[in-house]
Regions:
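Active-site-adjacent structural elements in enzyme catalytic domains
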Residues: 56-231, 285
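Short glycine-/aliphatic-rich beta-strand segments at the starts of folded cytosolic domains
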Residues: 17-26
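Active-site-proximal beta-strand/loop segments in catalytic clefts of secreted hydrolases
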Residues: 25-27, 57, 128-132, 143-146, ...
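Soluble non-cytosolic domains of exported or imported proteins
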Residues: 25-29, 55-59, 103-107, 168-175, ...
């Protein structure tokens, strides 16, 4: 199948107080554990084993690193400004970008879903309301198929985007793919075969509240809210980050397995919540998945040019055979042309996660679930 890549030319890292991008020339396990103990989000780390790690960090947390004796070099002192300047250049190009530095705002996401449904009713279903987010915003799904409003006996696949609010590349990629499918239906052999023989479901915006918060931070893009927007962090001294639950640590499979793969700290970027599925957003995904028969799911994130598969909650643990061979075979096919690094979290980004969506989908429902992390290290989140 043709691999559709959506390259938006984006950027590298974060915002809160001020976000910086720093490099630490020490990759030892001791340093990694010290960073985790200080609440550093290591989800997206550029690294060269044995030489350095490079990542985004709030300025106030960087101060804690200094106090702890961890030496680092500042690569970008103000990432929000860095992002905004690059996104401004992108948004001036002659392309159907959104108004948020080239990305769609929350309202534009909904508008484009409505547009797809109304303009291509022969292959795009009516919007399906799945439920409301913590702050009461609707979360929608849409199906692309040759009989979109009929439940046919065809294989289903699910694509999700924006579990993390600072990763809008995830839903932009899905919209690009949806538009490619509908615009080429009837003229392109592969697009036509897919829509004639599959039921392709899309939930492009799992975390609408976080996205709206980022719009408020910077309407031109670059906001670094990651989590949803539940009030969790009672600290007002700017020692940590924002309120919210990390939705991709809130699923039930191996939830709270340890404090490295997720955090019990309500102010942490990887805060897992008080219980599994405590959040309406993850409950919505759970209910939707359990009402369908998905053999495969792709939960889109950014960044890293990676394709990650379970299991992720403990280092070195692989799915049993024959599942491992299936994960590897599908993964190799999906990365044949884009050259993404494929494997488990440890094999790709070098960290563990627990309470994560793909682990839950595979561990509980035997779904071959993958996390495409799209965009290069230089692209970053925005």
């Amino acid at each position: 199948m043709k691999k559709i890549t959506f390259i938006l030319l984006l950027i590298a890292s974060v915002f809160a107080g001020n976000y910086q991008e720093i490099r630490i020339n020490d990759t030892s396990k001791e340093v990694i554990h010290r960073l985790q103990d200080l609440g550093v989000d290591l989800d997206h780390v550029q690294q060269k084993k044995g030489e350095f790690i490079q990542f985004a960090i709030p300025e106030n947390i960087a101060s804690l690193l200094s106090e702890d004796g961890i030496e680092f070099i500042v690569i970008h002192d103000d990432l929000e400004s860095f992002y905004a300047s690059r996104l401004y250049n992108i948004s001036s190009r002659n392309f159907d970008y959104g108004s948020m530095g080239g990305y769609y705002t929350h309202d534009e996401v909904v508008e484009h879903l409505v547009e797809l449904s109304e303009d291509y009713p022969n292959v795009v279903s009516e919007l399906q309301f799945l439920g409301e987010s913590y702050e009461g915003r609707p979360i929608y799904a849409v199906k692309l198929s040759d009989n979109p409003n009929i439940d046919e006996d065809e294989p289903e696949v699910l694509y999700t985007g924006l579990h993390h609010a600072r990763e809008p590349m995830s839903y932009m990629n899905l919209f690009y793919y949806m538009y490619w499918l509908v615009e080429n239906y009837g003229s392109d052999t592969e697009a036509t075969a897919l829509l004639n023989n599959r039921e392709m479901w899309f939930i492009p915006m799992v975390n609408p509240d976080g996205l709206v918060y980022n719009e408020g931070i910077n309407s031109n893009g670059g906001g670094m809210q990651r989590k949803n927007h539940r009030e969790t962090c009672s600290s007002n001294d700017d020692q940590y980050d924002w309120d919210g639950i990390d939705l991709n640590r809130n699923y039930s499979y191996q939830w709270a397995f340890d404090n490295d793969g997720s955090s019990p700290d309500p102010c942490s970027q990887t805060y897992r919540g008080t219980t599994p599925f405590s959040e309406p957003e993850t409950q919505i995904v759970k209910n939707f998945v359990e009402s369908h028969d998905f053999p495969i799911v792709l939960n889109y994130h950014s960044y890293g040019n990676l394709l990650i598969h379970p299991l992720g909650y403990i280092a070195g643990l692989l799915p049993p055979e024959p599942d491992l061979s299936v994960f590897r075979e599908f993964g190799n096919e999906m990365t044949e042309y884009n050259n993404y690094l494929m494997g488990t979290g440890i094999e790709t980004v070098g960290y563990t996660v627990n309470g994560e969506a793909c682990d839950w989908m595979y561990g509980v429902h035997d779904i071959y679930a993958y996390t495409p992390e799209i965009g290069t290290w230089d692209d970053g989140f925005w």
